[in-house]
Amino acid sequence: MDLGRRITRDAEHRYIGSGLMIRALLSALLFLTSGLAAQAANDIAQIQQGLDSPVIVDVRSEGEYASGAIDGALNHPLQGLPGTLIDMGVELDEEVIVYCRSGRRSAQAKTLLKQAGFQLVFDGGPMTQLEQVLEQSEP
């Protein structure tokens, strides 16, 4: 089947032509991202309440980390997780806060670490947001 013919035929299809498929996909995307945003907000609230002695992990690239990072943060790019934290001796029951530039990689990092058995992982989201939260929660 020729791709051009299939697209033409699909374009004439009632559901695609009327935009119902696109609307359904957008609705599903909004639903999924709102769930992630709610999880991140919950994590931020827990960070604000104060954690004992969390390991703060910057999951950005080495170059991004070199351009500036949160004081005391360790650089473990997303591609190396969870292995680099395990190799460093971070225990599965330690509090770990992950952050990045925009919040996308930190959400992925949280998922990877949870799947590896880390129990107390918090998504700090974007670096600028986490900096503000940490400053506000300092005594």
Identify the function of each model-found stretch:
Residues 4-6, 16, 23-24, 36-54, ...:
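Rhodanese-like catalytic fold shared by cysteine-dependent sulfurtransferases
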Residues 13:
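Cationic, low-complexity basic patches in intrinsically disordered or flexible, solvent-exposed regions
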Residues 25-33:
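Sec-dependent N-terminal signal peptides
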Residues 99:
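Short, surface-exposed ligand- or partner-binding patches at beta-edge/loop junctions that are enriched
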